[in-house]
Structure formats: C-alpha cells, structure tokens
Amino acid sequence: LVLLLTSIASHEGMLRNALLWLAVIAVAAGKAALGHAADAGIASAAIGMHTLHVLVTSVWGGLALSAGLAVLPALDTSTARGVLIRTAGQVSSVSLVAVVFVLLTGAFNAARGSGGSFEAIDASTWGHVLVLKLALVALALVLGGLNRFSALPRLRRSASTVDAHTFNNVMYLEALAMLGVFVAA
C-alpha cells in the first residue's frame, strides 16, 4: 500500500520521500518481527533494536553489493578515476558509520538472544547460524579495513590502474562476504 502511494505521489516531493522511508522501515520492522526478537513482544525494545540492526546491515550490505558488483567496476577506466576515488571514499565513510551500528546492535541482539550464555550459542541452531554470520562479518570487516586503510590511501596517492583494480577487487570480495551474511540471515 505504501509503495502504491509512493508511485502516485510526485516524483520529487517530500511526501514521496517520507513514504519511501516509511516503506523501508516497515519492511525492516517486518523482518525483525519474524525473527527471535519477536519473543519479547511486538512493541518491545528487542524489536526496535533488531529493526535498527536490519536497517544498518542493509545500508552496509547494500553499499558493498552495489559498489562491489556494479558501480565501482563501471568506473574502472582511467578517464573515470577521479569519480572512482571520490565514490570509493564516500562508500568507505558511510560503510564505516553503518558498521559501528551493525556491531552495536548485533552485540545487543546476541546478548539478548543467548541470555548472556555461550552455552546457548553452542547448543542451538540459532547460535550456529550466528557464529557463521559472525565469521562472514569478520571477513567483510577485514576486507573493508584493508580497502579503507591500505588500498584507498594508495589509490588516492597514485590514481594508478593497479591500485584501482586492487580496491575494486577487494570491494568485490567484501560484497561476496556480505552476500553470504544475507543468505545466512
């Protein structure tokens, strides 16, 4: 219904943007309400925190997937190198903010879901999936850190084709790791 109203609304209006954000939040809240957070009740802090977790994970994963699989490879020519460097910097900065929120909300969700017990993680399917997601997130964090602290500074200094390919290839691997996180979730 919200998406239908969005399509009817003006394409540049504030109402359309508000409706789109409402739809995004509704989808994230729906996803959160289908998971383990629903055990605490529909109007609970657990649902709110898990909704925020779904939203920020979508930002980080969406940026990684779109940048790694489509946008940055399309800018992989010497004539677009300046745009590639600016875009890579913006993707890295927004991703860093999203990652901080992913880790904070994820820690809250894990502590709440396990009751603070590592035994609950070890003895349950939910815990095994959580460990898999944590391993994939750790891989994505290592790849993102490699890009942010090694490949991107080199690319900014040299603007060379080799450094552009390095950044794009690592971003591609981060996108695959995030795809794995989404599949596991």
Specify the residue positions occupied by each region the protein language model found.
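Polytopic transmembrane helical bundles with strong interfacial aromatic enrichment
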Residues: L1-A185
